[in-house]
């Protein structure tokens, strides 16, 4: 018992032996906490998915056009089903969870993770990186699944930014277009404001940064 309370002398240095089990316990608690949080997030997504499907007949994802599918976080056999739609690239905007990179690599799926906190917009740098990556995938003739947790805010914001950039839509046109394809799209005020900022930024002709990322 006293061995836990005294300092041990090793190679001329005094090391508090009591810290060793404490550090081990801290690491264990951290692993348990992260695992519990992931299970809670998964349960929350499952409930949201079930609620939308039963109450509103909303889809977990919707085909936007021949290049894009917009939706929520992947669960169950979603990857197989999305591949059946021709999806071979995934862009994830969830800060709270990454996708299974090992599974995606094995399936030959191109992947980009841009972590954005829920209800917040992506940063300008993330928008530039995301659009540049999208342009690369389109040149490779890939179909892209863009998602966040439930596919209504963060992912829709980035796809709307691409519509502003590539299709020269304005903010109202981009949001109206997305809503016709996916009715539950609903951006927060912060996300709409970022769209407006990006639209103004494009008007200044500073989109050459995106071209550099895209490799044009």
Model regions and ranges:
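Non-catalytic regulatory/accessory regions that flank a structured catalytic core
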Residues: 1-53, 212-216
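Cysteine-based protein phosphatase catalytic domain of the PTP/DSP
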Residues: 54-144, 164-197, 203
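A phosphate-binding catalytic loop at a beta-strand-loop-alpha-helix junction
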Residues: 141-160
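Short, intrinsically disordered low-complexity segments
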Residues: 13, 22, 29-30, 141, ...
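C-terminal domain-closing interface element
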Residues: 200-216
